[in-house]
Amino acid sequence: MEIGVNVPNFGPGTDPGRLRDWARTVEGLGFDLLMLSDHVAITPDVAEQYPAPFYEPFTALSWLAGITDTIRLGTTVLIAPYRHPLLVARMAANLNQLSGGRFVLGVGAGWARQEFEALGVDFAQRGELTDELLRTVRDAWTNDADYRSGDIPIWVGGLSTAGMRRAVRFGDAWHPLRQSMDWMRNALGVLAKIAENEQRALPAFSPRILLRLTPEPLDERVAGEGSIDQVIGDLNQLEALGAEAVVLDPFIGDPAETERPETAWSALATVMAHRGDK
């Protein structure tokens, strides 16, 4: 099972030097994936969770590709309705080629209503627009040589039944974000039923989970939260459930965290040290 990191490409203190330090730290610790989030307009609803500055993921990942060697690079997740499908197909193909085949395209439908309004995109149509993007990107990569650049895995986010159906229809992997172990275990059963009804192969399971280490175990928590033993237990359970990859998200929610990445780096190092003891 691969383990990746959702690197904060936003917030106070984030600049090219900080992104470079993140990339070198994550690759140096031996992680398999480095992934970035996506927002275009930092409207109030976005800023509450992801404050400015915000580095556009394709741009930032292209730069990070040049200062990393082997770590895979991806989006968790690109908000599909914000960009023309053919632009995404070309940017993804170009980035995959420039990085030596290391790109993973994670896609989601989005949630920030004010951001949709600022961009002139119909929030109510976000599911349909996401389906259309995935359909168009797949078609461009398959049928137009100008867009081809090796195999690019598509991870589809979404927690609803519609999101799971989208992952079955268009994705190489289903990429749920920040849920409990019980929720994911039950949802995998739903995903399998959807795949059966759609008469399609079951996509891989590649969740993104929180990473928050606490001195003592927690009773109520989501996956990736609690003592190091609890977090390692979650990773072991996810591996037993068949997870192909797990992305750790060390951003807890305090904007000041992006100014002090050393805490996150320490947590990531602790996880890798304990995983190495398996």
Explain the meaning of each model-derived region.
Residues 1-278:
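Active-site-adjacent structural elements that line small-molecule/cofactor binding pockets in enzymes
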